[in-house]
From Swiss-Prot:
PANTHER family: PROTEIN-EXPORT PROTEIN SECB, PTHR36918. Pfam families: SecB. NCBIfam families: PRK05751.1-1, PRK05751.1-4, secB. Belongs to the SecB family. It comes from the Bacteria. GO terms for biological process: protein folding; protein tetramerization; protein transport. It comes from Photorhabdus laumondii subsp. laumondii (strain DSM 15139 / CIP 105565 / TT01). Its main location: cytoplasm. Keywords: Chaperone, Cytoplasm, Protein transport, Translocation, Transport. This is Protein-export protein SecB. One of its GO terms (molecular function) is unfolded protein binding. CDD domains: Translocase_SecB. The lineage of its organism: Bacteria, Pseudomonadati, Pseudomonadota, Gammaproteobacteria, Enterobacterales. The keyword Protein transport applies. Homotetramer, a dimer of dimers. One homotetramer interacts with 1 SecA dimer.
């Protein structure tokens, strides 16, 4: 029997927390007097680090910027963190877990926090659509593969 079949996979959420929150309405109160047809921009970023053997921190940064023309109506940023115990998962599976599975868990918390901040800023309700972190992670892997192939071709041509 192989060792891999004897290894059990284990995943546990230890803690979910808000690491950082920022809300700015730099053009208030003038922005409230304009017709509300904003251009909303959403930026996502994830970072992970190993805190101890098999214990990882994953931080999902969600930044939402709403602009009316050239003026920023509001800028909202939330860093939602989580501490996860992950055992028996390595390599690409671990990267997928940290880069997609954990952010999928964290996103609803970050979304709720952003919705609350925007509401407290007295702006119209903002509902962020669900994000497919699995698809984003697959795009990331594809970009990494293309970059490494491009680097190999450059070396072969030299």
């Amino acid at each position: 029997m192989s060792e891999q079949s004897n290894t059990e996979m284990a995943f546990q959420i230890q803690r979910i927390y808000t690491k950082d929150i920022s809300f700015e309405a730099p053009n208030a109160p003038q922005v409230f007097q304009q017709e509300w047809q904003p251009e909303v921009k959403l930026d996502l970023d994830t970072a992970s680090s190993e805190l101890a053997q098999g214990v990882y921190e994953v931080v999902l940064r969600v930044t939402v910027t709403a602009a009316l023309g050239e003026e920023t109506a509001f800028l909202c940023e939330v860093q939602q963190g989580g501490i996860f115990s992950i055992d028996g998962i390595e390599g690409t599976q671990l990267a997928h877990c940290l880069g997609a599975y954990c952010p999928n868990i964290l996103f609803p918390y970050a979304r709720e926090c952003i919705t609350s901040l925007v509401s407290r800023g007295t702006f119209p309700q903002l509902n962020l659509a669900p994000v497919n972190f699995d698809a984003l992670f697959m795009n990331y892997l594809q970009q990494q593969a293309e970059q490494s192939q491009g680097g190999e071709q450059t070396e072969q041509e030299a």
